């Protein structure tokens, strides 16, 4: 209700203001016409008066026109106010309908709130009017202040221009320093990349060196073990060679005895049948010994060749072993040549000699009793082939083959 009364009062005030403006305009027009009439009556020179009247009439027409425009604007405002008033009434009606649905306490509270808002609105209106008056005073004051500020700004502008030039010089110097720093940074970055690549390369080289060191240590240990095996094999072979030489000497002595017995059997020519059998058996044994000696010789030559290809023996050891093997091979060749000659003689001198047969049997039994044993294995010595010699040769051959594969 309070809002509705307020809107009505506002509309009436606007209407009164518009009516008063029209009244003022009419009064001005009446005064203008009255002045025009007075001027015409009192003037002795009608022409100037007419000009003045025309000028006044034009001014009046302009004023009337302006007043009519203001009047039209006022009516438009009045229409707008009425429309707003209608809207407010509709809103108020809606609010009223809503309020009717609520309790009386809420309605009283709402009305009190509306009244409070109206009072606050009135207070704000007063404050606004006071603020307008203050604003006028402040406008004048600010104008003066603005003039002072303008002068101050001119001074500050000059100072700012000088400062701007100085800042520009500083900025250019800073940009140049920045470029130098960027170049230095890029250089340091490149040096860091080079250092990082070098560090990675050194690390790879170090790891490769460590791996190579481990491989060399393993190879060294392996070669050390192989050297020990080779040394043991060489010592065993040396002992077997010494035993073989001793057996060879015994065989030569026995062979000499057989030769003497053969001469005796050739002179006696008794026991042809038994001597012939003994001769054949001796022939078979000599042929078997010859074949065995050839096999031993080939094995020794092969071992000699493999030992020559070995890289882990010293030159002195190789020379000593080579000399021993060559001497042994030469002795075996001479022995084979002698046995071949004796075999040829046995083939050409097969004459009956019965009395000498027991002597031949005794000499063969003596040969059996005089066989020696090898010091390395304890086996019965054979001047041409032993199990220990075969083992040594096989071990040496395997060692040489393994070295070839590794190389």
Curated annotation (Swiss-Prot):
InterPro entries: LPXTG_anchor (IPR019931), M_anchor (IPR019950), M_repeat (IPR003345), SMCR (IPR049896), SMDRR (IPR049895), YSIRK_signal_dom (IPR005877). Residues 360-380 have a biased composition (Polar residues). The keyword Chloroplast does not apply. Pfam families: Gram_pos_anchor, M, YSIRK_signal. A motif (LPXTG sorting signal) lies at residues 374-378. Residues 378-407 form a propeptide. The modification Pentaglycyl murein peptidoglycan amidated threonine is found at residue 377. Its main location: secreted. Residues 83-289, 344-382 are annotated as: Disordered. It is found in: Secreted, Cell wall. Residues 81-94 are annotated as: 2 X 7 AA tandem repeats. C repeats lie at residues 151-185, 186-220, 221-255, 256-290. Keywords: Cell wall, Coiled coil, Peptidoglycan-anchor, Phagocytosis, Repeat, Secreted, Signal, Virulence. Residues 1-41 form the signal peptide. D repeats lie at residues 323-328, 329-334, 337-342, 344-349. It is a peptidoglycan-anchor. GO terms for biological process: phagocytosis. GO terms for cellular component: extracellular region. Transmembrane segments: none annotated. The keyword Lyase does not apply. NCBIfam families: LPXTG_anchor, YSIRK_signal. Belongs to the M protein family. This protein is one of the different antigenic serotypes of protein M. Protein M is closely associated with virulence of the bacterium and can render the organism resistant to phagocytosis. This is M protein, serotype 2.1. It comes from Streptococcus pyogenes. The gene is emmL2.1.
């Amino acid at each position: 209700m309070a809002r509705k009364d307020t809107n009505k009062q506002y509309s009436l005030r606007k209407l009164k203001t518009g009516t008063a403006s029209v009244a003022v305009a009419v009064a001005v027009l009446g005064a203008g016409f009255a002045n025009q009439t007075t001027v015409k009556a009192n003037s002795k020179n009608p022409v100037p008066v007419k000009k003045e009247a025309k000028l006044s009439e034009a001014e009046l027409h302009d004023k009337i026109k302006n007043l009519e425009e203001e009047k039209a604007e006022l009516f438009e405002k009045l229409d707008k106010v009425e429309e707003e008033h209608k809207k407010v009434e509709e809103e108020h009606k809606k609010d009223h309908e809503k309020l009717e649905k609520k309790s009386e306490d809420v309605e009283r509270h709402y009305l009190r709130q509306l009244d409070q808002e109206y009072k606050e609105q009135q207070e704000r209106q007063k404050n606004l009017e006071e603020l307008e008056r203050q604003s006028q005073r402040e406008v004048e004051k600010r104008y003066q202040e603005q003039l002072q500020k303008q002068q101050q700004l001119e001074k500050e502008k000059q100072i700012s221009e000088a400062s701007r030039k100085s800042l520009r010089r500083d900025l250019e110097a800073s940009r140049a320093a920045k470029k130098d720093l960027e170049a230095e940074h890029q250089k340091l970055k490149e040096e860091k990349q080079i250092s990082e690549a070098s560090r990675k390369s050194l690390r790879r080289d170090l790891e490769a060196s460590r791996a190579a060191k481990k491989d060399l240590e393993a190879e060294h240990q392996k070669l050390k073990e192989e050297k020990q095996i080779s040394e043991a094999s060489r010592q065993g072979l040396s002992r077997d060679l010494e035993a073989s030489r001793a057996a060879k000497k015994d065989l030569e002595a026995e062979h000499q005895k057989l030769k003497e017995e053969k001469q005796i059997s050739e002179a006696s020519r008794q026991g042809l049948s038994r001597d012939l059998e003994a001769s054949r058996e001796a022939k078979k044994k000599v042929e078997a010994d010859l074949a065995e000696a050839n096999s031993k010789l080939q094995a020794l030559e092969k071992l000699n060749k493999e030992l020559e290809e070995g890289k882990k023996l010293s030159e002195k050891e190789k020379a000593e072993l080579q000399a021993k093997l060559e001497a042994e091979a030469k002795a075996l060749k001479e022995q084979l040549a002698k046995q071949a000659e004796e075999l040829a003689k046995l083939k050409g001198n097969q004459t009956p000699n019965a009395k000498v047969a027991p002597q031949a049997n005794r000499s063969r039994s003596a040969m059996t009793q005089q066989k020696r044993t090898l010091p390395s294995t304890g086996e019965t010595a054979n001047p041409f082939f032993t199990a220990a010699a075969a083992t040594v040769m096989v071990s040496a051959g395997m060692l040489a083959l393994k070295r070839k594969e590794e190389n």
